[in-house]
């Protein structure tokens, strides 16, 4: 009796895998957003969603980048819309690529500072200033959890 073995070169498997990823990215809706990691003293600002499928989950404030808009300009606009305040965009932190069930998210994250201390929640149901030790105390949206872990590990 012969033992038949099929040998498939690793590079061929990788090519098939890469093609499947490209196909999925083509099919899935692509969303590009920005997020503000607003720092004050030893804390960062987190907001709780008050709407949609991810209602009650926590995130860093921000939103979609409009066509022709730089990430920094989008961040200033989104914070003005969501929190009625002005920020300075200080330092790039990271870009997170995350596949949600219905879309692929690319999120550019920046450390930011408040230029005006007054904040008003226009879209969120709650907000908290969290120390790095408190970052695990809220239920983050999956992509934002990646960011929270990133900044916690960079201390």
Residue ranges: model-predicted function:
Residues 40-81:
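Conserved Nudix-box catalytic region and its N-terminal flanking loop in Nudix hydrolases
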Residues 111, 120-151:
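NUDIX/MutT-family hydrolases
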Residues 25-44, 64:
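Conserved N-terminal beta-strand and adjoining loop/helix that marks the start
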Residues 82-89:
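Short secondary-structure junctions
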Residues 1-27:
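N-terminal amphipathic/basic-hydrophobic helices that include classical n-h-c signal peptides
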Residues 86, 96-118, 128:
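Active-site-adjacent beta-strand/loop module that shapes the phosphate/pyrophosphate-binding cleft
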């Amino acid at each position: 009796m012969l033992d038949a073995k099929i040998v498939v070169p690793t590079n061929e498997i990788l090519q098939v895998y890469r093609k499947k990823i490209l196909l999925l990215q083509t099919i899935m809706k692509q969303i590009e957003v920005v997020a503000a990691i607003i720092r004050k003293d030893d804390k960062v600002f987190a907001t709780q969603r008050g709407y949609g499928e991810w209602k009650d989950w926590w995130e860093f404030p921000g939103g979609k980048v409009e066509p022709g808009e730089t990430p920094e300009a989008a961040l200033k606009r989104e914070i003005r819309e969501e929190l009625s305040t002005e920020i300075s965009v200080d330092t790039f932190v990271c870009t997170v690529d995350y596949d949600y069930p219905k879309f692929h998210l690319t999120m550019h994250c920046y450390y930011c500072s408040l230029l005006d201390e007054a904040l008003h929640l226009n879209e969120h149901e709650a907000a908290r200033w969290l120390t790095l030790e408190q970052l695990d105390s809220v239920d983050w949206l999956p992509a934002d959890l990646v960011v929270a872990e990133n900044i916690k590990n960079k201390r």
